[in-house]
Amino acid sequence: MKNIKIFLFIGVLMSASVGWTQENPGSEFVVARLKYSGGGDWYNDPSILPNLLDFMAERTNMSLGKSEAIVEIMDEDLFLYPVVFMTGHGRIHLSRPEAARLRLYLTSGGFLYADDDYGMDASFRTEIKKIFPDHELKEIPFSHPIFHSHFSFAKGAPKIHEHDGGPPKSYGIFHEGRMVIFYTFDTNISDGWADPNIHNDPPEVRQKAFEMGTNIMVYALTN
């Protein structure tokens, strides 16, 4: 299961463990934003991933890129990225070939982080069943390592934006014991990574969002 992850992502993992620098070509960690069909705004908040990478560069010993990559599921480059991120407010649609390819990516060592930006929850849950029809999204307990991989969140994912007044929720799908999808709902974590003038979040709220984002990336690269 982990062979592809070992061979394709080894530069990133070595970077995370021994602190490679820009002198090591090809070792930089870059998050790929997933461009999906269905009409949802997959491109939402273009500053979020570059800002998260900047934060991580200051607080980890990882060698990091400065910008996001944009990848579609059927792109050959999909398997070059250890972590794929998706967000949006609207509908997602996966064709059968896309669902099969995303399953292959995830079961070969890849990791998907999805953050509902208020409006994609129902669609996301429907489409994920195409990828893993026999798996259910399971709520992640606060004790899970993803909440403690670099910073500690004793009560799970932080609440960044209020919508319907519910508590922040975190879910996962596991394949052969490994979390392959991490999904946050009613949290808006990635909104907290946006430029300060976009949502006018207080500094302490943005800090928590960046810290949780760092946890997600560190966990994805080390599990």
Language model features: what each stretch is:
Residues 1-6:
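Positively charged n-region of N-terminal signal peptides that target proteins for export
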Residues 7-16:
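Bacterial N-terminal signal peptides
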Residues 28, 38-39, 47-48, 121-197, ...:
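An acidic, glycine-rich "communication" segment
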Residues 62-72, 114-117, 135-143:
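Surface-exposed patches in mature extracellular/periplasmic domains of secreted proteins
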Residues 66-73, 95-101, 165-169:
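Alpha-helical scaffolding within the catalytic cores
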